[in-house]
Amino acid sequence: MCIRDSYHINCAPHFKGSYTSNELPHFIANLPFECRGNTELGQLLAQVCTAHGVETLAHHATTLGPEYGTLVPLRYMNADQHFKVVSVSALCMAHYLDDSAQLGWAMRQAIEQHYDGTVAFLASGSLSHRFAQNGLAPEFAFKVWSPFLEQLDARVVEMWKAGQWKDFCGMLPEYAAKGHGEGFMHDTAMLLGALGWSEYGGQADVVTPYFGASGTGQINAVFPVTPVTGRDIPPVRASAANGYTSVATRL
């Protein structure tokens, strides 16, 4: 969901409904969904994230349903409703990437230190995310919008596969800006925070090769969890902010 203040976790006990995309209603319309929620985990995550200085609210008594970023993975990975689901807002409109990295790290700490169970993190976003210009959508249904964005994505994927996380984390703000990142790639910052940020020593295992969709760059990859200390996680920004900050600072 799109958020403008704090971070939000949708942890209702049960989700059921029908979804139509407000972005591409002719592509995704009346999609039925149902899954079990996990109120206990959602509330724990919010508590620990807030303790880490990242204000996070858990919503269990809500009529708000999951959206595209949650529903698409569920359609292909949870048709039997085996897994419980917690939805974390990642379309962040006025947030610091550093705070999203800290959020991811705090969630890992919550799970490893306080939760009795196995949890998977799904960062549901994209690489470059420049939709095809109006009138050209059919032509770019299975293409990336520009050669620049396609080459930019290709280099990023190679960095992931080679484990070049220090370089990638350093370039993430500029990549998010110049690559038209969906939600400014806060989902990626959260994922890398959970993995240890630039300290992370794993390599991405590409499940489906890079492909274009409506002008955007897409991939499915698995990032194995490795032992880390958290020493490279960026400090929080929002809770330490004092009045107006420039756009460059917020990035």
Segment roles from a protein language model:
Residues 84-86, 118-121:
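Structural motif
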Residues 5-102, 113, 134-250:
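Flexible, D/E/H-enriched segments
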